[in-house]
């Protein structure tokens, strides 16, 4: 089994740890930290996007300078959403206000509003909206990179199995090319927001598996 850059992911370096027993939100940070302490790189399958904050909290203990590539229809920069500061709509506000990442680059955004634009300016977020997207303009990363892929970053034609459909999104080829263009160390990743109840003939599941393969090829 190979990624498109011919990296084999049938490797003893890759081990499926199965499902974790999460009783409390912060168990995510603890379990991530335990694996990082053993020298592992971690690829997490969500779950909604709220999981990314505790995962990055754990990574920040190991990586003092961390870049994040977020592929998403939404900025997820709300200070609070429906009274919850740890909502799926808030993880990157928590990450950036805590200084856990040097740089946050968002690709695929097509739901920007005034509040999140203000948050993006506050945290110096590099947003690449779909309305004027040119993948060639996405700058190179200089620090260890964490990739967070929200499946609703894709156009619903490619990924119907998400909770929040946002037309006008990324194609599968655009995201593959974006991943293949990365030339810095990828130290971790997540894929989030897959909703099997809204999928059609497992289209989104197959796409998520393809993206996992391509990202794993960058991690080993």
Briefly describe each language-model feature range:
Residues 1-220:
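Conserved alpha-helical scaffold segments that buttress catalytic/binding sites
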């Amino acid at each position: 089994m190979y990624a498109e850059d011919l990296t084999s992911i049938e490797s003893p370096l890759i081990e499926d740890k199965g499902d974790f027993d999460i009783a409390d939100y912060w168990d995510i940070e603890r379990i991530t930290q335990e694996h990082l302490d053993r020298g592992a790189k971690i690829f997490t399958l969500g779950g909604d996007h709220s999981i990314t904050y505790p995962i990055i909290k754990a990574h920040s203990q190991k990586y003092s300078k961390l870049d994040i590539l977020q592929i998403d229809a939404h900025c997820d920069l709300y200070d609070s959403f429906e009274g919850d500061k740890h909502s799926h709509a808030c993880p990157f506000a928590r990450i950036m206000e805590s200084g856990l990442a040097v740089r946050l680059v968002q690709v695929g955004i097509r739901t920007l509003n005034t509040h999140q634009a203000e948050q993006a300016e506050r945290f110096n977020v590099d947003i690449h909206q779909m309305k004027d997207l040119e993948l060639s303009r996405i700058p190179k990363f200089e620090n260890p990179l964490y990739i967070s892929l929200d499946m609703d970053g894709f156009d619903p034609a490619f990924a119907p199995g998400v909770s929040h459909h946002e037309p006008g999104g990324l194609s599968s080829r655009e995201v593959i090319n974006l991943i293949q263009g990365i030339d810095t160390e990828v130290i971790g990743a997540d894929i989030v927001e897959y909703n099997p109840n809204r999928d059609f003939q497992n289209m989104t599941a197959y796409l998520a598996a393809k993206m996992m393969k391509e990202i794993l090829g960058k991690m080993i």
